[in-house]
Amino acid sequence: MSPDKATALTNSPLLNFVKELSGRRIEQARRRNGITQVQFAREIGISRRWLQEIESGNPSSRLDFHVVCAEHLQLKTGYIFFPFLFRGHQMEFPRELTYGDFDEIERECIDLIVRRNLSRMKQKLTPRWWSQQRTEGA
């Protein structure tokens, strides 16, 4: 990727929005758990200053650190990934969705993925003779 393209990606309004939203959620969860910035930064192996950058939603913060922080605080990460799912399909992400709880949406997505893949796996793993036995027994 060219440096110009990388710079354009880091200046993306969507990416900046996600980092800002993520930073707020990380800070809220950390405070709710009664963990100081110093403690949390030490736990995940970064400096307190870098954690401040993440929590403030600084555009220069790395998204992978947002994911590490969210996972460490046991936050679900749909709010990070769903906006990019929309973008990947050339759709604008409705920011109103970020005000709600993603739990149900995340579970429905997981359920859909599991159902589709279980069905396909079942077809692949079902021996041909099982269908022949059913036909012969009928």
What name fits each language-model region?
Residues 38, 49, 78:
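Key DNA-contact positions within bacterial/archaeal DNA-binding proteins
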Residues 58-63, 89-91:
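Short, solvent-exposed alpha-helical "recognition" segments
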Residues 24-43, 67-68, 95-104:
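Short basic helix-loop element that most often maps to the first helix and adjoining turn
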Residues 2-32:
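A short, Lys/Arg-rich alpha-helix, primarily the initiator
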Residues 45, 64-80:
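DNA major-groove recognition helix of helix-turn-helix/homeodomain DNA-binding modules
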Residues 44-61:
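Recognition helix of helix-turn-helix/homeodomain-like DNA-binding domains
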Residues 120-138:
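Short, charged, intrinsically disordered terminal tails
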Residues 7-8, 81-121, 129:
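Short, charged recognition helix plus adjacent turn
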